């Protein structure tokens, strides 16, 4: 019996070698927190900050991922606080119940299309500019404002380094 010199055909059609239908994952195919949005390929930085604007937890997602998707994993990393202040992008029943279960008061304005309205402390909500100032300080560094790093791990490492400096 003569063996074919084209051994790759055996694997391609279910012969010897890899099991049929099984493929090697693409190199670099793991999540690199790059998403497509109107502005092109982007990365979204989710952050928890304390009352002085120091980042306590950071998370990266693709730019096309909704803000609410990063909220619970980020909040689960830290102990519960008295209040959690967030913008309208975080107004969801499941997040409010998650915060209530932790004993935290959500200070989140209602979305315009919300049927059931929740009261929120507008004076406390004014403190939300602390996180906006934190993002401004972080993005003063060009490497953060314009993501040059290919991998999410390297970008997050640079972000953590800069957050420690700010």
Q: Where are the model-predicted features located?
A:
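Short alpha-helical elements
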Residues: 1-166
């Amino acid at each position: 019996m003569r063996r074919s010199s084209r051994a790759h055909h055996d694997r391609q059609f279910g012969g010897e070698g890899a099991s049929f239908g099984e493929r090697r994952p693409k190199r670099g195919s793991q999540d690199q927190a790059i998403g497509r949005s109107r502005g092109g390929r982007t990365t979204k930085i989710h952050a928890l900050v304390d009352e002085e604007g120091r980042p306590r937890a950071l998370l990266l997602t693709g730019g096309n991922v909704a803000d609410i998707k990063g909220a619970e994993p980020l909040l689960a990393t830290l102990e519960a606080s008295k209040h959690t202040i967030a913008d309208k992008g975080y107004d969801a029943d499941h997040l409010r119940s998650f915060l209530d279960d932790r004993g935290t008061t959500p200070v989140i304005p209602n979305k315009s299309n919300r049927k059931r309205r929740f009261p929120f402390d507008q004076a406390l909500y004014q403190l939300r500019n602390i996180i906006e100032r934190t993002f401004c300080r972080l993005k003063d560094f060009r490497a953060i404002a314009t993501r040059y790093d290919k991998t999410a791990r390297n970008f997050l490492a640079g972000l953590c380094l800069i957050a420690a400096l700010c």
